UniProtKB/Swiss-Prot annotation:
One of its GO terms (biological process) is D-amino acid catabolic process. The gene is dtd. Keywords: Cytoplasm, Hydrolase, RNA-binding, tRNA-binding. Its main location: cytoplasm. Its EC number is 3.1.1.96. It comes from the Bacteria. This is D-aminoacyl-tRNA deacylase. It is an enzyme of class 3 (hydrolase). It is found in: Cytoplasm.
């Protein structure tokens, strides 16, 4: 399971022109679910995402996590993250989970996040338009 996390000052996701999720200070989490992922991996990744220190302390060091800054999380499904891009000029998607499994684990991950801090989410498998202001920019690839 993969989370591409971005520290944002704001982020929103729209479906058919309607805002379905929106946050101010926090993390935009693009979530990719792989074939062998399960609830244990989702829980471990949620713990990493919500405790990963990407926000600056009083000394300017990235020493604080999203919970410590009273931030929020916006979780957006991103089926292209597990893609195989090692060869050629077209990505292969065989490493991604079956859509039904991916949706179940995406919902599970998002539900776990909601238990920890304010969480918004995109709409699984929808054509989404994601806007953000990346603060830094600060972006990390987390994988379990």
């Amino acid at each position: 399971m993969i989370a591409l996390i971005q520290r944002v000052s704001e982020a929103a996701v729209r479906v058919d022109g309607e805002v379905v999720g929106e946050i101010d200070t926090g993390l935009l989490v693009l979530l990719g679910v792989e074939k062998d992922d399960d609830e244990a991996k989702a829980k471990r990744l949620m713990e990493r995402v919500t405790t990963y220190r990407v926000f600056e302390d009083d000394e300017g060091k990235m020493n604080l996590n999203v919970k410590q800054v009273n931030g929020k999380v916006l979780v957006v499904s991103q089926f292209t993250l597990p893609a195989d891009t090692k060869k050629g000029t077209r990505a292969g998607f065989s490493r991604g989970a079956h859509p039904a499994d991916a949706e179940r684990l995406y919902d599970y991950f998002s539900d776990l996040c909601e238990q920890e801090l304010p969480t918004e989410r995109g709409r699984f498998a929808a054509d989404m338009k994601v806007s953000l202001i990346n603060d830094g920019p600060v972006t990390f690839w987390l994988q379990v």
